[in-house]
Amino acid sequence: MLTIRPATEKEYRAIVQWNENRGEEYLFQWAGFTSYQYPLTEAQVSAQAKKDGVTLYMAFDRETPIGAGEICDINEEMKTGRICRLIFAEDAKNKGYGEQFLKELSRIAFEELGLVSLSLRVYCFNVNAIRCYEKVGFRVTEFFEEENSHWNNYSMELKK
């Protein structure tokens, strides 16, 4: 059974481990280009998690951390927010955990935080992630063409 809760400092190591030996492009794929530098360190994860408006959540299968993601960029006036920096352990992928995690993050955003809309960005090549987001109800709202077309991406949105 999947459970989620806000991450604690001791769990940041798992996020770093999920990136070990994966390369810079993998880090960019799940975290974007601005939040972290390769190679990822616990200090970087800690600094990101402590930023105003960021809540880092961990997903667990029993007591084992298997995934992480943020609710961030909350606009209280517009009641909007973003889901950012989603990552899962390699052995937790393609088992339905991503869908469960997103559903729970969405529930927290809508029911506990009072948001009415969530958005996220995803690279066009990340077809598995796009399918997962669509299963939860996210829909593509915008396409962003980058100078390097490999990094073209979509904005997706889920409304309450």
Ranges and model annotations:
Residues G81, V116-S119, Y123-I130, K135-K160:
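C-terminal "cap" of GNAT-fold acetyltransferases
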Residues R85, A89-K103, R107, S117, ...:
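Conserved glycine-rich acetyl-CoA-binding loop
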Residues M1-T3:
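Extreme N-terminal starter segment of soluble prokaryotic enzymes
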Residues Y12, Y57-F60, Y97, F110, ...:
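Aromatic side chains
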Residues P6-Y12, Q17-K93, L102, I108, ...:
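Acetyl-CoA-dependent GNAT
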